Amino acid sequence: MELNKIYHMDAFEGLKNIPAASVDMVLTDPPYGTTENKWDMPIDLEALWKELKRITKSNAPILMFSQMPFTAVAVMSNPKMFRYEWIAEKGNATGFLNANRMPLKAHENILVFYKKLPTYNPQMEKGSRTLEAKVEAREIMAIFAL
């Protein structure tokens, strides 16, 4: 397959054309199977993992967008390689048709899988909400420490 070229084809057929251990990172947003739309049919995760394991280098991260309940299915499809998740805040919430029955969905999960630890360059901001939350968590834990 030619580098930096977009191919319109079945994903599994395309994956077969990628050489083994040649991919530095995978970023995928597979169908979640949470709607009745034709394009949202679940894919064979076992077959996907077989190809992703074959084409990725040993330290290549595999980042997979997901949303519950697909998140649970995706994690359990490869618990050995699952490491952690990131939360991506959406600019616009979805799920307005069900707004009378449940909260709108304002985030997606990004699941992080890998075989060996990839290069990670932390991005930190002083005073970010995440940092503040960690401080609060430490303070709460200190209250319960006997």
Language-model region placement:
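Core catalytic lobe of class I
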Residues: E2-L146
